[in-house]
Amino acid sequence: MIFYTADLHFHYEPFLPSRPFGSVEEMDRVLIARWNAAVSEDDTVYVVGDVGYNRGLVPGDALARLRGHKHLIRGNHDTGFENAGELYRYFETVTDFNEIDDGEVHIILCHYPILYRRRGYMIHGHLHQARGPEYGMLRQMPRVLNAGVDVNFYRPVTLPQLIENNRAFYSGENDALIPPPPPPPPRGGGSVTAGCRAGRISAPFRPGLILIRSDL
């Protein structure tokens, strides 16, 4: 079975005010427990970016405890680890972009949302539970799905679960269950790079970054 998730941010305290946990230790413990309750060793999990915090170390102690065959599509918090090579110990592949088939459904995977209206689905992270200008745009695009743990009950989910959770998020049905979004990142966060089918895109990081591709 194939699962999707994003924006775990293990060990990252600044996100606590926007999550229902009293400490980083509790957050990490719940994320690991819910992952392993859903995923078996034979399952495949695509992590669509941001396993930790860009200026720290790879959270290997947490990643080593997660079940399944894991694949990372890097986000802006996965490119600046002091020991970035350690990611390859915990993930079978580490890429900036990926395309797969989930059964008969074609899937595009990128940390940053791509405006997409064609066959299959585009699965992203990065936005957490943000309600900025991108929210109104993406709620009109049901083929663009947010895999972030903040809108998926802090666990990896299958494609049908992801579709339903996004429907509930964009309809406002789950508003009472989702805390406010995290604070904006520090200024001057460097750059982010995402791969796309017709080449690569490089842009300065800013909250709510959306990649617009006419060829997808």
Describe each model-derived feature in a short phrase.
Residues 49-65, 79-90, 119, 133-136:
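Metal-dependent catalytic neighborhoods of phosphoester/phosphodiester hydrolases
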Residues 5-6, 46-50, 70-76, 109-110, ...:
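Active-site neighborhood of phospho(di)ester-bond hydrolases with catalytic His/Asp-centered motifs
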Residues 87-175:
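Conserved beta-sheet core of the metallophosphoesterase superfamily
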Residues 1-59, 143, 147-152, 165, ...:
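N-terminal active-site segment of His-dependent metallophosphoesterases
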Residues 188-191, 206-208:
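A cross-taxon signal for low-complexity, glycine/charged-rich
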